[in-house]
């Protein structure tokens, strides 16, 4: 039996409530291949961050399992790097030392020069250098802090990179710049990424597939949308691809209308459970081609 790089099987998370257990999400099953960039989108409260915490080993599911490279995830590991929206930097250390701290933990046998050179290389990859690496987080802008956080995550060369709305607190210009840098780094390193976002345009720019969650409680992963657009992707050109707006319109329609229509009930029947365990695979760009619109190309394997 062929195994996928990341396998999520029938995840559920429940929390104690005044009237019994509250089921945030249930029967979440999906896979991610090595080198794939997958985004997950859904309204606040549907359990996206909780799923990410389970993948990171920071939380345990109420039901279900997560396997990475055939091994069940049961706790935190340097094989999984996490970037949070709030940066999570050590305030008493410089940008460089925030990265070297992680690198030393990953490779304790490296000498000081190896650690420093490796860390500085990743800071340069995200546009930090020429003295900025010596500043403490309080001396950096929000965008620069997030660059440090991203550099730290990439520097430990994790098998899986987890991004929890990493650009949500940034202004539009800074967010766009760092998104472009992330695209370049992921294309160069073939990094496997799972990312939470509320921004449909960001998801289309970055992802190979987009998972769509219904509203909570009893949230489900309803669809897996293929982003059938060519790489490398440039934000100045991607919006002109005939496949772009079919994908975007599909995502917006789900968030505005269908996410609520499909939400709010337990999977009491076999039909409901089958739907929850097997997200519908959707390819809006291909469907647009079949309807007579000509996309400029199919997504290339990374």
Stretches with model-predicted labels:
Residues 41-43:
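The feature captures the beta-strand-to-loop junction immediately N-terminal to the Walker
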Residues 56:
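Helix-to-loop junction immediately C-terminal to a conserved catalytic motif
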Residues 64-76:
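Conserved ABC transporter NBD signature motif
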Residues 93-102:
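Short coil-to-helix segment of the ABC ATPase nucleotide-binding domain corresponding to the Q-loop/switch region
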Residues 112-131, 184:
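Conserved ABC ATPase "signature" region
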Residues 136-140, 144:
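Conserved ABC ATPase signature
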Residues 157:
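Conserved catalytic motifs of ABC-family nucleotide-binding domains
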């Amino acid at each position: 039996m062929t195994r996928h790089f990341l396998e999520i099987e029938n995840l559920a998370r429940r929390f104690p409530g005044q009237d019994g257990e509250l089921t945030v999400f249930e029967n979440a099953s999906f896979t991610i291949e090595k080198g794939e960039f997958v985004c997950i989108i859904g309204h606040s409260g549907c359990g996206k961050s909780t799923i990410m915490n389970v993948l990171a080993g920071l939380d345990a599911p109420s039901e279900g399992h997560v396997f990475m490279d055939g091994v069940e995830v049961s706790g935190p590991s340097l094989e999984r790097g996490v970037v949070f929206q709030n940066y999570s930097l050590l305030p008493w250390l410089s940008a460089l030392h925030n990265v070297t701290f992680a690198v030393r933990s990953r490779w304790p046998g490296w000498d000081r020069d190896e650690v420093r050179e490796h860390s500085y290389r990743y800071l340069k990859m995200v546009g930090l250098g020429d003295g900025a690496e010596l500043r403490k987080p309080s001396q950096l802008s929000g965008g620069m802090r997030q660059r440090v956080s991203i550099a730290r995550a990439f520097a430990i060369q994790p098998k899986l990179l987890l991004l929890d709305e990493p650009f949500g607190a940034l202004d539009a210009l800074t967010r766009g710049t760092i998104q472009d840098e992330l695209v370049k780094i992921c294309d160069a390193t073939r990094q496997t990424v799972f990312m939470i976002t509320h921004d449909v345009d960001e998801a289309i720019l970055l992802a190979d597939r987009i998972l769509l969650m219904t509203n909570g409680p009893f949230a489900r992963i309803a669809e897996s949308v293929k982003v059938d657009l060519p790489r490398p992707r440039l934000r100045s050109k991607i919006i002109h691809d005939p496949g772009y707006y079919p994908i975007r319109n599909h995502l917006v329609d789900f968030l505005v209308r269908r996410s609520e229509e499909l939400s709010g009930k337990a999977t009491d029947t076999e039909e409901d459970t089958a739907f929850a365990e097997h997200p519908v695979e959707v390819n809006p760009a291909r469907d647009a081609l079949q309807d007579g619109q000509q996309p400029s190309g199919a997504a290339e394997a990374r």
